[in-house]
Structures are given as C-alpha cells and as structure tokens.
C-alpha cells in the first residue's frame, strides 16, 4: 500500500497521458478509503456507511474544454485526503475525457454528452468512453437504494448567461428531484434551477 495514489494529484495524473495511472487503493488515517479504478475514476468511501448514506457521483470533463469543474473536483479530493473536508457519503469522481482536455477542445469526434442514452451510434472515441462510463456508473450504483443516488454532472458555461451559477435538472424516466437534493442545491446559493421537462442534449 502506498502513501498516495497520485504522483501530483488526481487531476494532473488523469491528464498526463504519457504516464500510466494504475488502479490502486489506500486508506487514510481517519478510515476513509480512496479507490482508483482507472484513469479519471476515483471512488471515496467513508469509514462508516449505513442505509441512510448517499451514493454520489461528481462527474466533470464530459466536455474537454470545460476545465473549471475539474479544478473544483481536484480541490475537493485534496481536502478530503488532507482531512480538512470530512466525508460521510460514498463518492465517485469522474474526469470523463482527458484526451479531449489535452487537445483543448470540447470533443474529438462526437459530443460525448449526447451518447449516454441507449441509441445506436457509429463507433468513435467518445462512444467507447460513454459505454465505459455507463458501466462504471452502473457498477457504482449496484445494490444501492435508488432514492440515495445523486449524480452531479459539472459543467461551465461557454456563453454569457443571465445567471452566473445555475442547475439544470434534466428530464429522466426516474424520479431524481428529491427534496433532499433541492435543499442541497439551495444550500450552495445557486442562482437558478431549470427544470427541463422535454428531452434535450
């Protein structure tokens, strides 16, 4: 067991495609487990879990040129590692498309954000990433109560917006707009929440 999973940090190591990023696991002094599944995918498990624990995914970098959320995620992970930020919920951090980030572009061949449904698409780098991420998400949520699952997909606006910070709650086949989630959003002093009631990309 090593003292640290990363040469520099989760973000820097995930983006350094010239270096391997082998899977590994460490437990820090307070009992929190850090489990690196693969490049860009890190699970954080608190020392204590029960039936009330949430299972939260924080994904970013689905659009490779939206880098601010990646820095935010990296800071959260560093704060958890140092013990500054206590963690009571099971977490999965995802940096989705390191190759696109390194290319300073939104995507390479196809918009990754449009590939997470069950339709058939032509084979692209992004389709392979989407299929892998869907498997990772399914594995993370396996045997967990549906009402304890949150997925926060972090983006940053590339155009001027009326609201500096906002949440988009997409239309889904499953109930995802829980009171607890909305209270969490409110606690973050987000400017606005947009409830999308029609399919969107």
Task: Describe every region a protein language model picked out.
Residues 1-201:
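Structured catalytic-domain cores with a bias toward divalent-metal coordination
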């Amino acid at each position: 067991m090593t003292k640290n999973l990363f040469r520099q940090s989760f973000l820097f190591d995930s983006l350094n495609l010239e270096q391997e990023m082998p899977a590994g696991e460490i437990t820090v002094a307070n009992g929190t487990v850090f489990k690196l599944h693969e490049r860009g995918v890190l699970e954080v498990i608190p020392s204590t879990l029960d039936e009330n624990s949430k299972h939260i995914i924080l994904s970013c970098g689905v659009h490779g040129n939206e880098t601010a959320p990646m820095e935010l995620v990296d800071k959260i992970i560093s704060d958890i590692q140092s013990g500054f930020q206590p963690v009571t919920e099971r977490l999965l951090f995802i940096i989705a498309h390191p190759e696109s980030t390194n290319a300073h572009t939104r995507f390479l061949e196809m918009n990754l954000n449009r590939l997470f449904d069950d339709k058939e698409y032509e084979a692209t780098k992004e389709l392979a990433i989407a299929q892998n991420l869907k498997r990772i998400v399914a594995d993370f949520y396996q045997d967990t109560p549906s009402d304890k699952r949150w997925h926060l997909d972090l983006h940053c606006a590339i155009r001027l917006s009326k609201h500096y910070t906002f949440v988009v709650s997409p239309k889904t086949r499953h109930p995802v707009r829980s009171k607890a989630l909305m209270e969490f959003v409110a606690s973050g002093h987000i400017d606005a929440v947009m409830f999308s009631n029609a399919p969107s990309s």
